[in-house]
């Protein structure tokens, strides 16, 4: 048993296995991108229409509110524009050659798949900077891509697919900055890259703000801890040591991004007391009625509903809602049945049991896991700030609207990998002298995650209404695949 365990660990730790995981993730994303009828459930129509809107203007930002109704909210004050601007470039090319909607949507979805796979590569690189073994890191990546909503999101148009690599890239830059400080190397250039990436992330999606806050807090703490504050002469020498071209690029990019950051978040805060404004704060509510999230919240706010202000009770419901929407498979807004969703019980039950037991075990060994691992501490700190921010925003909506809204598991994707790795580390410490037990847990977990995990749930639960219309080959391919994986779902009988 011990020898078998060692062989499996060697396989998991191999670079080939790491690349194989990324290849499987790409395959899954491409499958979803090619098969799924437009629009998919995760606001894909909203993002596609904004891409088209960006293609009609020269400026990379929308600085003037379009006339008429506001189906996309207060666009002129919305900072989340980077993803839509970037994809508007290939959209223009596709439009110029007269590509069909099928070709256009699938092609743009491929860019989303590429962004996600880039993020997976960067997160692998980041997590290998921790004290965790390569086998543990690759196991975390494997379980992550088997979460059903991960390939579903990767294969559609959504700015979360760009947010994923931006979070990884920023944290990777922060880790490099910290390493240079500890080793007493020149750190100023890396600090500037980190600031640049943080600003860029906030212009892709406003939920990057807590990540930026955590990163800046950590950077300032590192500077203070190593007594680098006040050393103007040293900082000036580092500045002079940077190549002129690098200095100009960094300063120019930071200046542009900082101006945009202040234009959106700064002006919003000053004028509307909110860095992310509500539609009715900027334009007439009658025009906002066509913006579905605003209309939903507006109607809920008009209805007096008493809710328990107990944060513990909310947290239980919030955790359950997040968990369900991490592990469900869902179709889009078209077809006879809209937003039909299913959860495969084997993967859901396995994830629940492993998470709860793993959390208890991890708390027992947390100090030992994080000892002498500042990179892991930094990553988890940023992740915790993000989760608390997300929870706080949802709790505030709950108190003001009387219902839980926007409880979506996919919002956890950008920071989920480090926490999966933390749970794996907990199991490793708890059973460090029992390789046979670790092997059984690992193989059983992989087996259960295979039932409904990745794209298997999509293939099993979907039907012709879930696929692009008129694409007979796609229907036959999914039907054949459903037959092949049907033995995994015998538990339903």
Question: At which residue positions do the language-model features occur?
Answer:
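Membrane-lumen/periplasm interface segments of specific transmembrane helices
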Residues: 221, 225, 246-357
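Extracytosolic helix-loop segments that constitute the early lumenal/periplasmic catalytic or substrate-binding loops
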Residues: 28, 45-78, 82, 92-95, ...
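Perimembrane helix-loop-helix junctions
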Residues: 1-4, 178-179, 211-258, 367
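Transmembrane signal-anchor helices characteristic of membrane glycosylation enzymes that use polyprenol
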Residues: 13-44, 52-61, 71, 253-270, ...
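Short acidic/glycine- and proline-prone juxtamembrane loop motifs at membrane-interface regions
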Residues: 41, 149-163
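Transmembrane-helix signature of polytopic, membrane-embedded enzymes
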Residues: 97-102, 123-146, 164, 185, ...
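Transmembrane-helix motifs of polytopic, lipid-linked glycan transferases
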Residues: 106-131, 169, 357-361
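Membrane-interface alpha helices of multi-pass inner-membrane proteins
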Residues: 189-206, 211-216
């Amino acid at each position: 048993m011990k020898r078998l365990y060692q062989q499996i660990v060697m396989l998991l730790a191999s670079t080939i296995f790491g690349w194989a995981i990324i290849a499987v993730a790409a395959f899954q994303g491409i499958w979803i991108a090619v098969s799924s009828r437009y629009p998919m459930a995760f606001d894909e129509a909203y993002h596609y229409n904004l891409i088209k809107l960006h293609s009609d203007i020269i400026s990379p930002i929308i600085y003037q509110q379009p006339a008429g109704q506001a189906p996309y909210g207060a666009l002129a004050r919305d900072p989340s524009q980077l993803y839509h601007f970037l994809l508007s470039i290939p959209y223009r090319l596709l439009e110029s050659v007269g590509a069909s909607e099928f070709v256009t949507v699938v092609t743009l979805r491929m860019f989303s798949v590429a962004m996600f796979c880039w993020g997976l590569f960067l997160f692998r690189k980041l997590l290998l900077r921790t004290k965790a073994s390569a086998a543990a890191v690759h196991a975390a990546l494997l379980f992550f891509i088997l979460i059903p909503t991960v390939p579903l999101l990767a294969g559609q148009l959504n700015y979360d697919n760009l947010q994923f690599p931006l979070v990884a890239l920023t944290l990777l830059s922060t880790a490099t900055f910290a390493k240079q400080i500890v080793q007493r190397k020149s750190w100023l250039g890396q600090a500037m890259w980190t600031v640049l990436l943080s600003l860029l992330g906030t212009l892709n999606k406003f939920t990057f703000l807590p990540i930026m806050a955590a990163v800046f807090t950590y950077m300032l703490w590192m500077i203070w801890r190593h007594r680098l504050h006040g050393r103007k002469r040293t900082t000036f020498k580092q500045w002079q040591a940077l190549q002129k071209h690098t200095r100009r690029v960094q300063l120019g990019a930071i200046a542009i991004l900082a101006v945009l950051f202040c234009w959106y978040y700064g002006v919003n805060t000053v004028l509307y007391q909110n860095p992310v404004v509500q539609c009715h704060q900027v334009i007439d509510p009658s025009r906002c009625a066509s913006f579905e999230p605003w209309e939903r919240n507006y109607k809920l706010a008009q209805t007096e509903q008493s809710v328990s202000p107990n944060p513990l009770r909310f947290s239980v419901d919030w955790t359950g809602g997040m968990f369900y929407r991490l592990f469900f498979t869902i179709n889009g807004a078209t077809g006879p049945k809209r937003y039909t969703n299913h959860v495969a019980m084997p993967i859901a039950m396995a994830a629940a049991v492993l998470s709860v037991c793993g959390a208890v075990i991890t708390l027992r060994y947390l100090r030992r896991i994080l000892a002498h691992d500042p990179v892991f501490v930094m990553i988890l700190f940023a992740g915790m700030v993000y989760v608390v921010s997300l929870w706080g925003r949802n709790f505030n909506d709950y108190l003001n609207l009387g219902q839980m809204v926007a409880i979506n598991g996919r919002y956890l994707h950008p920071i989920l990998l480090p926490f999966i790795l933390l749970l794996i580390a907990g199991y490793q410490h708890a059973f460090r002298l029992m390789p046979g037990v670790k092997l059984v847990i690992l193989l059983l977990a992989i087996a259960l995650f295979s039932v409904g995990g990745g794209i298997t749930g999509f293939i099993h639960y979907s039907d012709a209404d879930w696929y692009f219309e008129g694409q007979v080959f796609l229907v036959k391919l999914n039907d054949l695949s459903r037959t092949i994986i049907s033995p995994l779902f015998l538990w339903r009988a």
